[in-house]
Amino acid sequence: MRKAYLAIICLFTGFNAFAQHTDIQPVPQQISESGQLITLPGSYQFTGDTEANPYAVQQLKQLLAGNHSAKEGLRIYIGEKGDKAIRKFARRIPNQKEGYYLCINDKEIVLAGNDERGTFYALQTLSRLLKDNQLPAVEIKDYPSIRFRGVVEGFYGTPWSHAARLRQLKFYGENKMNTYIYGPKDDPYHSSPNWRLPYPEKEAKQLQELVKVAKENEVDFVWAIHPGQDIKWNQEDRDNLLAKFEKMYDLGVRSFAVFFDDISGEGTNPVKQAELLNYIDENFVKVKKDVTPLVMCPTEYNKSWSDPKGGYLTTLGDKLNPSIQIMWTGDRVISDITQEGIRWINERIKRPAYIWWNFPVSDYVRDHLLLGPVYGNDTRIADQMSGFVTNPMEHAEASKIAIYGVASYSWNPEKYDSEKTWKDAIKNIMPASAEELEFFAAHNSDLGANGHRYRRDESVALQPVAQSFTDSYIKGEKYNENDYAALQETFGRMAESGDILLTDAENTPLVKEMKPWLTQFKLLGETGEEVLAMAKAYAPFVRKIEIEVETLDQVKEAVEAGADIIMLDNMT
């Protein structure tokens, strides 16, 4: 009877019954709350913890400090659909992959996943809700809108360090991202000429650790190979590729990708590419049973580079096994994903595209930090994409601002709020200095002029003020005092924010990455303050000097006119 009563408490908490005030990223599909806050008692009765996702159980017990074997206390139900412990909540669990049901009230907490990853995501939501040993009474029914969500380390330049990758994987798990594609362009064992060779022992052990940490955070570690520049379309290289995959499989890798991007020559042949990929799919992926669908990046990976007459994309669409995922960057190398654009590519490849979004990657504008909001992608096309991964900067910690936004967008595009998510990302990454980081990021978000013609908003509030002040000053008119005050405040904040962030000990890897830009930001603020002071001191004399210059010009004209008259008199 007691169990039935407890179940009814959750089941009768109808969705949309209460105003939604709880702040969670990514935004859940459905959430309702009563307004009640529950203080955690410190003693808990666990049910299902021996059957449920072990990584979720471990983190849950770390989160809920106290006695986990109490005879009396807050009841915790945890498990996956089909487990006895959560059977009575089965109807509330979403049917979608990675979906979960979370219910919190003063009698119990229920974390019920459609699968193990769903249970893990229920825990991540619970973790976000916990503040000062209190939880809001809520009922959440949630699932991702896009199947594969995450990051592709696919930029040119200095690859991320091992420590940075470990931090990244934990970050992905916390933000419900399930994919990390390892494909750094400057890894010699990922690409030509060494793709056929096994990793040296040190690098192999590091990859093994990455795979382990990825698994603990419910992230698929996708190892990518880039063989196209020197591959031979023969059985020997087929065997070489499978042998390399076997080596990676032995290291724990269970997800694989083959990249044919940024190459030329014979390796670009779509028929041969399709034959090779199908061979891998049939002789490796399907044989292993525990390997996720194969992913490929085509040579014509954006619309502007495609040749419809050549039939490259339609060949892949016709010949590739249906389970193989095809990556796509959009209308151009660097572009946002539109409804029209996704429809165009899907018609040709005959499957939902797997989006490789080239933001905030900065390997073509390396003097810029791209710390602005994630925006521009259509929010109505989730069902037309099989995956959405972001290509980041070589600055791993700084990339987390955009990665956080992509996590939120790809989980629930229809409820995605770019500005709010951006602010939340900054608070998540550097809570104590969030105000200063937000100010710095607002002035470090655009790429500047570049060959890809891709731009982002930057210094939005400052630009009209600066333009108004400058125009007035150049014309010799009295400038607007409000403009002057706004500029003075901005330059002052630049100097102050730069100084605070440079000495911040909260996120030292982030500060280290941003240090050159922070130093410049601080100096720009200090210089701006000095220039404004000089401009103010000089302003009263501007019109006076202009009048004197005009007078001198008139005198000069008169003198020159008089000289001309004298010359004419002498000639006559």
Could you say what each language-model-derived stretch is?
Residues 17-106, 114, 132-140:
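Acidic, contiguous N-terminal accessory segments
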Residues 418-533, 537:
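C-terminal functional modules
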Residues 218-221, 291-293, 350-355, 538-546, ...:
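Short beta-strand/loop segments at the ligand-binding rim of alpha/beta enzyme cores
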Residues 529-571:
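Glycine- and Gly-Pro-enriched alpha-helical subdomains that act as flexible
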